[in-house]
Swiss-Prot record:
Cofactor: Ca(2+)
Organism ancestry: Viruses, Riboviria, Orthornavirae, Negarnaviricota, Polyploviricotina
One Pfam family cited in the UniProt record for this chain: Neur
A biological-process GO annotation: viral budding from plasma membrane
Bilayer-crossing regions: 7-27
Enzyme class name: hydrolase
Naturally occurring in which organism (per UniProt): Influenza A virus (strain A/USA:Memphis/10/1996 H1N1)
Protein's name according to its UniProt entry: Neuraminidase
Glycosylated residues (UniProt): 44, 58, 63, 70, 88, 146, 235, 434, 455
Amino acid sequence: MNPNQKIITIGSISIAIGIISLILQIGNIISIWASHSIQTGSQNHTGICNQRIITYENSTWVNQTYVNINNTNVVAGKDKTSMTLAGNSSLCPIRGWAIYTKDNSIRIGSKGDVFVIREPFISCSHLECRTFFLTQGALLNDKHSNGTVKDRSPYRALMSCPLGEAPSPYNSRFESVAWSASACHDGLGWLTIGISGPDNGAVAVLKYNGIITETIKSWKKRILRTQESECVCMNGSCFTIMTDGPSNGAASYRIFKIEKGRVTKSIELDAPNYHYEECSCYPDTGTVMCVCRDNWHGSNRPWVSFNQNLDYQIGYICSGVFGDNPRPKDGEGSCNPVTVDGADGVKGFSYRYGNGVWIGRTKSNRLRKGFEMIWDPNGWTDTDSDFSMKQDIVAMTDWSGYSGSFVQHPELTGLDCMRPCFWVELVRGLPRENTTIWTSGSSISFCGVNSDTANWSWPDGAELPFTIDK
């Protein structure tokens, strides 16, 4: 073979090898593309961790979590059929209260994006519990937090976030424009009640599964307001209480029965010497029990209980262990309003067990500071101040605020009874801490257990002032 032939042969072999290599590379690219397409399919999931997809169809909640690991989608599915919450169970027997959640939102908000809020509360479906709150349309440590001590403004909204998490724009769900609110789940969907508008013409907007279903106009034109805690659902019906009228005298109080977001019945309480505001309600053996705030003239708490036909009974907690703030020192109680230090008040709660009562209250008689739970074995009906158990929740030196009840249904817990729980708002900032320009709060929650519990203090713990305050 002469030199020219050798050169031609070597060149031909090189070209052939190059073509084969190119074909292999093209095949490799096609293979990678096809493999990726098969993995992602029509779902078109991005690489976001813990993306939650909730689909509602044929009365079944399908809850799936997609976790992307090395381009491989692992799907953990859990189907839970919707069910109407019966609400017929009695309260679980308990010996004390176990710490359930603490969101530390003020501490986190000094550096992170956390909403300025007040009036947080908790409500549970048969699948989950959520924290609801009234935001001020502002973030902590930001200029729009200035002046958020104001209760009613067009910037306030009811929102919710996963239980125990600090409420932020990244984990919160909008529910309703509102400066007074309530929410509850009937086993099929969320009912939300959001009140907004001027003092002399506010309107309550009812939503069911996020869709407006009805409105209720202020009937006295004097600051229509509702519970600031969960409403109660039983056998497909949900119940709430609203107040319209003076905060320092006799007002108008109505109970509403609501089905799938629509009012099916309402009554006005005949209670001329009573004052009901910001009621904390819970189901117990097929009835609804509400323990409320008397802002007019009672340092003990008024109550109203009613059945599903709205037949009702009213009274005041008789115990000499007084539950409101401000209040006198414990002493002789009354089954009528205890008028000593009876003006003003704070949202609170109690749980009735026969003739006994668990009373939640601030430790201070004058300031919204500290919190404790007291068991008075005869306090629902007797007027003495004897009690048999006290559990410390927040120390006297630390700020508290509103408190309220919520329950966990047997459909959630698997128990054969209704688990009683409560939350406490830990308010910081104005008007008491005047080194700040804002008012907001974090929250803690506890649930009743028939086992050992701890006495301690779980305060807010944020160091004030913030950068925006200086």
